[in-house]
Amino acid sequence: MAADAFLLIFGLLLTVLIVAQPLGSGLARLIEGETGTLLQKFEAGTARLFALDTTEMRWQQYAAAILTLNLIGIVVLFVLLMAQGVLPLNPENMPGLSWHLALNTAISFVTNTNWQAYSGENTLSYLSQMVGLTVQNFLAAASGIAVAFALIRAFSRRCVDTLGNAWLDLFRITLYVLLPLSLLLALFFVSQGVLQNLLPYQHLTTLDGAAQTLPMGPVASQEAIKLLGTNGGGFFGANSAHPFENPTALSNIVQMLAILLIPTALCFAFGKAVSDNRQGHALLWAMGLIFIVAAAVVMKMEVIGNPHLLALGADSAANLEGKETRFGVLTSSLYAVVTTATSTGAVNAMHDSFTALGGMVPMWLMQIGEVVFGGVGSGLYGMLLFVLLTVFIAGLMIGRSPEYLGKKIEVYEMKMTALAILIPPALVLLGTALALSTEAGRSGILNPGAHGFSEVLYAVSSAANNNGSAFAGLSVNTPFYNVLLAVAMLLGRFAVMVPVLAIAGSLVVKKRQPESKGSLSTRSPLFIGMLIAIVLLIGALTFIPALALGPVAEHLQFGLTH
C-alpha cells in the first residue's frame, strides 16, 4: 500500500512538472506581450471592434477593469438564473432559482469558488450551465491569471508605473491558453465516455420494472474548464464522483493533472519572467513539500480507517464510505488533497465521510490560503504574499532592509501583505462564529457534536478561500447560508486581489537593485524552509483552536467511545 501511495504521489507530480514546463514558457511570453506580428494585428483589430483602449494601465485602472468585468458577470448570471424558467434550452422545464440561491451561485462562479448549494441535474437548464456557468469559469480563471501577470510584471519591470492592460491580458489568456487547452481536454473526456449533448433526460425502465431517469447535457465542455481553471463546480450534484463526469481511472488521473497544470506552469513562468528560473523552482519546492506531506497523511488516515471494523468481521478497516470503488481509497484521498490544495473544490469522493483527521487535512489546506499550488493565478500571488512576509521577517532577523528580487519591501507593501493574508482567516472565524451563534445557522447542522461544528467550519473555510468543496452534511440552501457564504466568497476573492494589485503598483515603480554578497538568497533550501515554516505558523496560530474543537475533538471522541 505504501508503494502504491508513493507511485501515485510522485508519478502525478513528475508528470505535472514535465507537462507544465513548456506551458510556463508560453505564459512567460504572454506576460512580456510576445505574441507575434500576426496575432498582434488580430488583437488590434479585435480591440477596435469592441472599442477597447489597449494602453498600459496603472494598478488602480487595472483593478477597476477586473472589478468591473466581475461585477457585470455577477449581475448577468444572477438575472439568467432567476429567469431560466422562461428561457430556451430548458428541456426539463427547470424553474428559475430563488433570489438567494441565484445570488449565491452567481457570486460563487464569478469568484472562482463554484460553491454549489444545489444539484445541477435537477436545478439548472442547459442554457444556465453553458452560457452562465461555463462562461464564468473562463472569465474567473482569466481574472486570477491576469492579476498574477500584473504582480509578476511588478518584479520584472523597473521605474515605470504601469502593469499592462487588463483587457488585453484577459483576451490573451482566454484565447491563447484556456480555450485551446479546454478544447483538447473536452475531446479527451468525450473519448472516455463523458456526456456532451443537448438531449432531454432519458426515462427508462430497469429490468426489475423500476423507473429510472438518466440526466443528459453538455458535460465535457464544462468539465474541461472546471478543472483547468481550478473552478470545480460540477455539472451534476455528485461532481467528479458521477460516472457521466469522471467515468474511468484514466479520466480521474487526467483530471488531477489538469487541476495542477496551470498553477505549476505559472511558477515556471514567474522564474522566466524575472530572469531567474530558480525563483520559480523555489516556490515549487515549497508547494510540493507541503503537498507531499498532506497527501501522505490523508492516505494514511483513510487506509487505517476504522480498525473496529475488523472486530466485526470486515476484510479491511480502510475507509471506503463515500468513495467510488472504481477509484479506491488511495486515489480518492489524493484527489481530495489536489482539489483543496488548489482552489478547485471538485470532488470524486465525499469529504464528509472521510475520517476525522483525514478530513481535517483538506480543510487545513484551504485555511492556509490555498497557496500549495492554489488556484490559477491566485495560488501564485497568494504564495508570493507569504514570500514577502518571509523576506520581511528574515530581514529583521539579520538586520538588513528586506528586499525581494532587488526590490525593497517597505511599510506600504507590508501593510497590504498583512491585509491580504489576514482577511480570509478573519472571514472564516467570524463567519463560523456567526453561524453557530444564530438559530438560522444552527438549524442547518444535521450532525451533532464535533462533526457538526466541522461541517460549518469547512463550509465557511471553503467559501472564504474560494474553494467550493463541502462537508455535505450541512443544509446550506437557506437564505442565511446563501447570503453568509456569498459575502465570504466576494470578500475572500476581491479583498485579497485589490491589495495584491496595490503591492504590484508600489513595486513596479522601484529600481531593481543588483544582488550583493549580503543579500538574502530567496532560492536557497534555507529560505524554502523558512517560507514553509511561515505558512505553517500562520495557519497554526490562526486555526488550531478551531480545529481542536472540530476534527481533533471528533478523533479523540472516536477513540474514547469505542
Curated annotation (Swiss-Prot):
Indicate how the chain sits in the lipid bilayer.
Multi-pass membrane protein
Record keywords: Cell inner membrane, Cell membrane, Ion transport, Membrane, Potassium, Potassium transport, Transmembrane, Transmembrane helix, Transport
TM stretches of this protein: 5-25, 63-83, 132-152, 175-195, 250-270, 279-299, 327-347, 356-376, 379-399, 416-436, 483-503, 526-546
Name a GO CC annotation attached to this entry: plasma membrane
Would the keyword Membrane turn up in this protein's UniProt record? yes
**Mainly localized where?**
membrane
Quote the NCBIfam families the UniProt record gives.
kdpA
Subunit structure of this chain's protein: The system is composed of three essential subunits: KdpA, KdpB and KdpC.
By its UniProt entry, which HAMAP family does this protein fall under? KdpA
Q: Describe the function of this protein.
A: Part of the high-affinity ATP-driven potassium transport (or Kdp) system, which catalyzes the hydrolysis of ATP coupled with the electrogenic transport of potassium into the cytoplasm. This subunit binds the periplasmic potassium ions and delivers the ions to the membrane domain of KdpB through an intramembrane tunnel.
Q: What is this protein called?
A: Potassium-transporting ATPase potassium-binding subunit
Organism of derivation? Pectobacterium carotovorum subsp. carotovorum (strain PC1)
